[in-house]
Structure formats: C-alpha cells, structure tokens
Amino acid sequence: MESDLEFSNIVSVLKLVEATTQRTVMAKALSSLLAKTPPQVIDKVIYFLLGSLRPDWEGVELGLAERLTLRAISMATGLPIRQVEELYKKLGDAGEVAKRAAEIKRSKGGGGTIFDFIDTGPKRRLTISKVYDTLMAIAKASGEGAQDTKVKLLSSLLTDAEPDEAKYITRFVIGRLRLGVADMTILDALSDAFDVNRDLLEKAYHVYPDLGKIAKTLAEGGEEAVKAIKVTPGVPIQPMLAERLSSPKEILNKLGGVAICEFKYDGERMQIHKLKDGTVKIFSRRMEDITNQYPDVAEYAREAIDAEEFIVEGEGVAIDPDTGEFKPFQELMHRKRKHNIKEAIEEYPINLYLFDVMYVNGQDLTDLPLPDRKKVLFSIIKPHEHVHHADWIITDDADSLEKFFLDAISSGCEGVMCKSVKLGSVYEMGARGWLWIKYKRDYKSELSDTMDLVVVGAFWGRGKRAGTYGALLLAAYDPDSDQFYTVCKVGSGFTDEDLKKLPQMLEPYKIPHRHPRVVSKMEPDIWFTPGLVLEITGAEITMSPLHTCCSVMLKGDVGLAIRFPRFTGRYRTDKRPEDATTVKEIFEMYSNQKKVKLTDQVP
Ligand code: ATP
C-alpha cells in the first residue's frame, strides 16, 4: 500500500472542500493530503482533484454520457434501471444517485456490510491507482462496443466503491466534480506540502502546465528536477498577457520612449506548435487543443513556416472571402461546432497574423528580447496567402502611434498592442506585465475597458424575469490570495435568449453555500463555484460598501464596484476564472479614471 493511497483519503478531502466556506481550511486539507501521498501516485491524486484525467491540453475525455453512467450504477448495485432513473429524476445529480444506490444496496446486505468488510478485508478498498487506471481505461476504450466496455469498467469500479466514493467517481466521470480547486490552489498546496518556493513551481507551471507532472517531478526529484523542466513542442506554454493604458504618450513613456506597435486583431489567439514528426498542434489562449477546429490554419502554418520544429503565436481572424475584410470575433464561433468544419472552412476562411516566436529547432527563444525574436520570426515566415506577420510599426512618436491606432480601428481591429523593445523584453510566460500594453478603442468610451468577470452567485428574477435569474453576482480575481472578490451585480445587457440559457449554463456550478474562494458581503439566492466568465462594461468604477473588490487596497470596509454594469453579450469561454480581470487591474482602472477626472478639471 505504500506506493499507493486509499481512495477514501481523497474522498475525505473532497467532502471537506465541498462543505467549507473557508479557503484556509480547503488549502490545509489539500496540502496535508499531498504531503502524505506517495510520490508514485501524486500525479493521479492531483488529476482527480482537478476533475480531469490529464491536463486539459491533452484533450483526454472519458466519453461516457450521463445516461450510461446510470446504467453502470444499475449494474453495480443490482437496482433495476427504472429505479435508478427515478432516483435521478428526484435527485437531479448522477453523483447523488450513485451514492444513494450504493446505500440501498448496502442496506439490503449486498456488500459493504460489516461482515463483507471483515470477509474481504482491505483488499477490496479502492486505491487511487485502481480508480485512476480504470477511468483511464474507460477513456481509452474506442471503436465498436466501446460504450459497453466503458459501462462495464465503470460498474466494476462502482461495485467496489463505498457510497461516498461512488458519488465522487460518478461526478468525475460526468465532468461535474467542479470543486473550484484550481491549478493555482494546487500550486499553493504543493508549495506548502513540500516546503518549496511557490515561484519555482509557478515558473515550471508556466513552461509546462501539467500539475500532475510537476508534482511527480518534485516528489521524486526535488527542486533541481523541477528547475530542469523545459519548453517542449507539443506542450503549450502559458501565454504572455498585456497591461492596458489609454494614451499613446503614457504608453511610450512606460515603454521607455520607443515601441513596436502592432494591430490588435479581434480573433482567436493561437499558439501553434510543430513537432519533429511533422505534427502541428494549435492551442487556445486557455491552452486547450483546438487543432480540430482549425485544420486549415494547421496546414497553413505547416506550409508557411520554414522550420522543422517551432512554437509561434498569432491571432486567427475570420475574413470575408469576397472583400478580404476582417470579420468580428463572433464569426469564429462557427468553428466551435464540431460537425460542419468543412463547410465552416469554406464559408468562414481565416487568416493567421503571427506576432511572436518562442521556440525554433531545439532552441527556447523565450529569454531573448523581442527584437531578436522578431528577427527569427521574419526569417521563418514564407510568403503565404493566409499567413502574415501582424501589421506593425516601430515608433517613438505619440502622433504616429495614434495614427497607427486609427488605421487599426478602421481596418476592423480592436486597437493596437504596443510592445517593449528593450533588452529585458523577454517572452514573459503567464504574466500580465508592462512589456506589452494594449490600447483599445473602447478605452475612450464610458469605462476605460471592458472587464471579464466571474459569476459567483445569482438572484432570482421577478415580474418578467420570474423563473430565471434577475441578476448575477460577479467577481474579479486576486492571484495573490487565489480568491474572487465581488465587484458588481449585473442585470442588464441580457437578451431573452441569454436569460433562458443562463440557468442551464450555470447549473453544473451550483453549490449550497458560498465557495471558499469567494469573498462576498452579499448573499445571493444561489451560489456558484467560480467557473463562467462574462464580459462586462459599465459607466465607471466607484467606491462601494457592498462589494469586496480592492477592499484590501483601500484599507477600509469599502470596496470598488462597477456603476451601471452591463453584459456585452460576450461569454468568455476562452478564459478560465483565473484569467478574469484581476482586482489589481480594477484598482488601476479606478486610479486612472480618477486621474482623467482631475485633468478634465484643469482649465
Ligand atoms: P482582451 O480581453 O483585451 O481580448 P485578453 O485578456 O484576452 O485581452 P490581453 O493580454 O489583455 O488578453 O490582450 C492580448 C490579446 O490580444 C491576446 O490574447 C491576443 O488574443 C490578442 N492579440 C491580437 N493581436 C495581437 C498582437 N499583435 N499581439 C499580441 N496579442 C494580440
């Protein structure tokens, strides 16, 4: 048993995490669990806690529909399928059904009684390896008869499971573990459990976002082994992010007087990898493998980039085939529907605008300054109808920057990205820093920018909105404390269609109490695990005693809130909750807004 861990240990932690509203309790439970986990299985424990068999970018899916899990529950417990389906109707959660069915089986003497336990002894107790390996076998079953194999494998696992174990295994299978245990939470727990510097782990995570691998490397090889984790084609790296400012002068000042400025295209960010064996993979901003949606772009990259192995980055933009003009971001949504990719490729062609290179033929370029990376990038792009370098200038003049910005806007772009060219202008993985600064059109409208906020609660609607949500409680992210702070209650901007689908979209995130990573003074009618990210605009940012956002910075009992918040209609499914606008950004927007007001008053 020493090289394995009884699954019940994980279940105890899951129960605790599910019940608590305190982040410290959750963090302590996770770190104690990891501290006592044998190195051989620490990766499996972490994948289970995160609710995913492998890191998301590997795209491993169990492929077992909820209906089939009910069949497995019926097989494992001997309850007739009709009874299991009735339980499902009543309880509405396959996990609870699995638990209830196992309890019924136990009450009928069908296993799990005290005698059973003595009979078969500890042999029958599930371990994490048994659970994980079986789930992996379920994911791998393919071809004819795969569904039956999957159901049988699951039912064999559930047969050996205690009621609570059955509940969490089933939730995992249907993708509803959703405990709000995020990558950052695990990094904290690892750093605490192994008493290692968190920055070291975070750095490795930026280079190789696979917490199972990082944990195992740490547990088996110590800090040195973690430091040796390298950029690897085929494994996405955490994208570099930009800060924002609202005037060319400020931007040039911040960047040391001169900058490379590029169009900020309104499409989908693509990190494109070519491996030695010729495979091309495309990863999204949140590092999901989106190659299947863009086989055309993968082919263009293969044709247009002259290197055996590479990692480059660019924006894929939908183009009007008749005019060659850019189409808005929403057009790319047609690519998300899995079935008619071929048609979508014809109807919605895409151009790729490259703006960075991070790796070429065995060499990690992320530590090179931007001008050096650009040289490499220009040297490997061959002329191609659909692949170009992003439109760019290098300038030290605010008027030229403003003119370039207006050009970008009139070409249908969102604005410009201004990038540092100084010696230290490395590719900063996973960081939102001042080496890249975005300057967008909507900076000049009401609020200085839209914000991407996380839904953490909802209030029932009345009148016309009876039966659906009247408003949502939204929060910003604080990476330092790994918590979400509320910043507004938003009820406007939702279409009838939005209102109809929101309860459905949010159903999987529903929890009975405030999530331990949410800091809120408000008490909504429904709480959610932070998951869904929405784009919000508003009139201004004001102080508010009702919200908790930035209350730490304001050092008082007041926080910051968005006045007249409105949903822009954009669901940011390309962002994880941890990619939402941060409290620090909101504080900066608030401070800038104050500055603008003061200068407005100068005669
Ligand atoms: P936003 O919410 O403004 O779209 P974001 O939060 O997704 O931005 P940011 O770092 O704020 O990410 O802005 C950078 C985004 O702009 C990138 O993710 C990328 O998709 C897009 N982009 C378009 N053109 C460029 C460019 N030339 N250089 C870098 N990023 C670009």
Swiss-Prot record:
One GO biological process term: lagging strand elongation
Reactions performed catalytically: ATP + (deoxyribonucleotide)n-3'-hydroxyl + 5'-phospho-(deoxyribonucleotide)m = (deoxyribonucleotide)n+m + AMP + diphosphate
Transmembrane segments annotated in the record for this chain: none
Entry keyword Ribosomal protein: no
Protein residues bound to ATP: E262, R269, R285, E315, F355, R432, K438
Stored CDD domains: Adenylation_DNA_ligase_Arch_LigB, OBF_DNA_ligase_I
Keywords for this protein: ATP-binding, Cell cycle, Cell division, DNA damage, DNA recombination, DNA repair, DNA replication, Ligase, Magnesium, Metal-binding, Nucleotide-binding
EC number: 6.5.1.1
Entry cofactors: Mg(2+)
Cysteine pairings via disulfide bonds: none
InterPro entries linked: ATP-dep_DNA_ligase, DNA_ligae_ATP-dep_bac/arc, DNA_ligase_ATP-dep, DNA_ligase_ATP-dep_C, DNA_ligase_ATP-dep_cent, DNA_ligase_ATP-dep_CS, DNA_ligase_ATP-dep_N, DNA_ligase_N_sf
GO molecular function, one term: DNA binding
Catalytic site positions: K264
EC category name: ligase
PROSITE patterns per record: DNA_LIGASE_A1, DNA_LIGASE_A3
General function of this protein: DNA ligase that seals nicks in double-stranded DNA during DNA replication, DNA recombination and DNA repair.
Recorded family membership: Belongs to the ATP-dependent DNA ligase family.
This protein's name: DNA ligase
Gene name per UniProt: lig
